[in-house]
């Protein structure tokens, strides 16, 4: 299960940024090139495990886009991207997000009360971005059928549980100076 993803993670280079061990991977960074077979493996797996009875697939700019786009193409479900810049459209919702290494503002367009979405993201670590997004969607009256993260690192997903959301993390990892270690694979019992 998810052999390409697991192999690519274990073989990811790790660099030190201050005290933080940072892994570099095509899904989280777009570096090196993203192998279409890797994207296909991930998309096929998500289709198997996620509630895809939705109006739209929702992702966050930028690195959630490749996987969400593949899902959209495979399922025929429209794709909505939460952007990092405003478009000043009617109904646009602004949200502040904070991660372990940055703060910013995101903008939701094209969603309304009663819409059903599946959220797909590349990585969850601190949970700051997804936490802000889930809160905003709940306040809008948007129904979240599932939250999917390709890669999980750390315990940030616990924050989502406080909002009644149980994310599905495909592969949970630990990163040290020695490299990336696989901790868990969703559905691998």
UniProtKB/Swiss-Prot annotation:
Predominant location: cytoplasm
GO molecular function: guanine phosphoribosyltransferase activity; hypoxanthine phosphoribosyltransferase activity
Entry's Gene Ontology cellular component terms: cytoplasm
Statement on biotechnological application from the UniProt entry: Used for negative selection when transforming this organism.
Pathway stated in the Swiss-Prot or TrEMBL entry: Purine metabolism; IMP biosynthesis via salvage pathway; IMP from hypoxanthine: step 1/1
Subunit relationships: Homodimer.
Keywords from the UniProt entry: Cytoplasm, Glycosyltransferase, Purine salvage, Transferase
Function, in words: Catalyzes a salvage reaction resulting in the formation of IMP that is energically less costly than de novo synthesis.
Disruption phenotype: Cells have increased resistant to purine analogs 8-aza-2,6-diaminopurine (8-ADP) and 2-methylpurine (2MP). No change in growth rate in HS (minimal) broth.
Database matches in Pfam families: Pribosyltran
GO biological process, one term: purine ribonucleoside salvage
Location(s) in or outside the cell: Cytoplasm
CDD domains per the UniProt record, alphabetical: PRTases_typeI
Protein name: Hypoxanthine/guanine phosphoribosyltransferase
Gene: hpt
Lineage, highest ranks first: Archaea, Methanobacteriati, Methanobacteriota, Stenosarchaea group, Methanomicrobia
Signal peptide: none
InterPro entries reported for this sequence: HGPRTase-like (IPR026597), PRibTrfase_dom (IPR000836), PRTase-like (IPR029057), Pur/Pyrimidine_PRTase (IPR050118)
Organism: Methanosarcina acetivorans (strain ATCC 35395 / DSM 2834 / JCM 12185 / C2A)
Catalytic activity: IMP + diphosphate = hypoxanthine + 5-phospho-alpha-D-ribose 1-diphosphate; GMP + diphosphate = guanine + 5-phospho-alpha-D-ribose 1-diphosphate
Family that this chain belongs to: Belongs to the purine/pyrimidine phosphoribosyltransferase family. Archaeal HPRT subfamily.
EC number: 2.4.2.8
């Amino acid at each position: 299960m998810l052999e390409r993803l697991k192999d690519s993670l274990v073989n990811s280079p790790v660099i030190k940024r201050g005290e933080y061990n940072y892994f570099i991977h095509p899904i989280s960074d777009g570096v090196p090139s993203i192998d279409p077979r890797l994207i296909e493996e991930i998309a096929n797996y998500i289709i198997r495990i996620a509630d895809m009875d939705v109006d739209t697939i929702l992702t966050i700019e930028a690195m959630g886009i490749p996987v969400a786009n593949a899902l959209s193409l495979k399922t025929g479900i429209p794709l909505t991207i939460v952007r990092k810049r405003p478009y000043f459209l009617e109904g646009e919702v602004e949200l502040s997000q904070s991660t372990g290494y940055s703060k910013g503002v995101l903008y939701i367009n094209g969603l309304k009360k009663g819409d059903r979405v599946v959220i797909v993201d590349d990585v969850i670590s601190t949970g700051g971005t997804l936490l802000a997004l889930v809160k905003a969607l709940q306040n809008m009256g948007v129904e979240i059928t599932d939250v999917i993260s390709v890669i999980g690192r750390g315990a940030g997903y616990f924050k989502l549980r406080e909002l009644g959301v149980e994310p599905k993390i495909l592969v949970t990892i630990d990163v040290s100076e020695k490299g990336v270690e696989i901790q868990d694979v969703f559905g691998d019992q």
